[in-house]
Amino acid sequence: MPQFILLLRDDRAAVNGSSPEELQQLMYKYQDWRRTKATGGQKLMDGEGRVLQKQNGKPSVIDGPFAEAKEVVGGFFVIEAANYDEAVEAAKTCPHMEFGTIEVRQIEKT
């Protein structure tokens, strides 16, 4: 069955406005969702990251975090679905929709 990656982009303002209790409840929702829908996934480290880009023909590294971005990739899930429509329907049920966006991309078989 095809695999899809769900890239979870956090709206930092929404996350920062949540109480510790609300965040704990959200983590429980993530755990339940992952057990039933995902074949893999991880939360990414807060405040870490590097972007590589070519400058003057050579790789250049920019350190994160990227505070100027309204949304940052905060994690990902890998799911199996028959097609994009099914993957999108699964993504709609992800608790991440409460405070962020989800990009759905099919993983190419190698």
Q: What is the predicted function of each stretch?
A:
Residues 1-110:
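Conserved, structured core segments of small domains
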